[in-house]
């Protein structure tokens, strides 16, 4: 029953309804052509050089590059931080970093990041099943205790970072992961929360090539 305002008028109904799962109900997906992919020939030389290098290595251009290239300054900032987190030195293996991306992106319902980074995870792990298992329910995936602890921490950062407590850090420490490792885990989860939301908001879709990689 609608409530009334101070002057007896019916209060406006909320514009957003919650589903049974507690998430806002959804309309049609964002059309990808609202933010079209950039034309390679129109980009600054440094962006073109990076994208061509990716194309030569992968055999195709992942859509994230051409979508973000619409704004060159943001492209540079995004990939500088991405590279620092995902390719820099640190206590986490490359596969562990990709697991974080897949698990937290699944929580955020980001099709692009789950599919794209799931492909990379399959390659690093040499396991055609692992990405699906981590995305659907990592707690049931055949993972070592260290990986499970990493994903527990990462998913808590993704869903309820204010609830993190000393016990969360202590559990990581039990698996040889100190405060700096926890920083890395949190940084990846937080960075990809940004990536997930931009992918969803821009209508970014995974390239078909990703689905076949590592199978």
Language model feature labels by segment:
Residues 2-215:
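Hydrophobic alpha-helical segments
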């Amino acid at each position: 029953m609608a409530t009334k305002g101070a002057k007896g008028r019916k209060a406006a109904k909320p514009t957003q309804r919650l589903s049974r799962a507690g998430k806002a109900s959804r309309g049609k997906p964002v059309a990808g052509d609202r933010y079209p992919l950039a034309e390679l020939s129109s980009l600054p030389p440094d962006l073109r050089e990076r994208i061509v290098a990716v194309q030569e290595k992968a055999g195709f251009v992942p859509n994230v590059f051409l979508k973000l290239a619409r704004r060159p300054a943001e492209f540079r900032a995004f990939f500088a931080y991405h590279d620092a987190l995902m390719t820099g030195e640190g206590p986490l293996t490359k596969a562990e970093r990709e697991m974080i991306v897949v698990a937290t992106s699944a929580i955020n319902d980001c099709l692009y990041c789950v599919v794209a980074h799931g492909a990379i995870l399959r390659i690093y792990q040499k396991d055609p099943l692992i990405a699906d298992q981590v995305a659907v329910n990592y707690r049931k995936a055949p993972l070592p205790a260290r990986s499970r602890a990493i994903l527990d921490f990462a998913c808590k950062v993704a869903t309820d970072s204010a609830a993190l407590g000393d016990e969360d850090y202590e559990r990581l420490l039990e698996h040889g992961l100190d405060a700096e490792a926890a920083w890395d885990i949190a940084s990846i989860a937080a960075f990809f929360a940004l990536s997930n939301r931009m992918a969803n908001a821009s209508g970014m879709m995974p390239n078909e090539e990703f689905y076949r990689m590592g199978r």
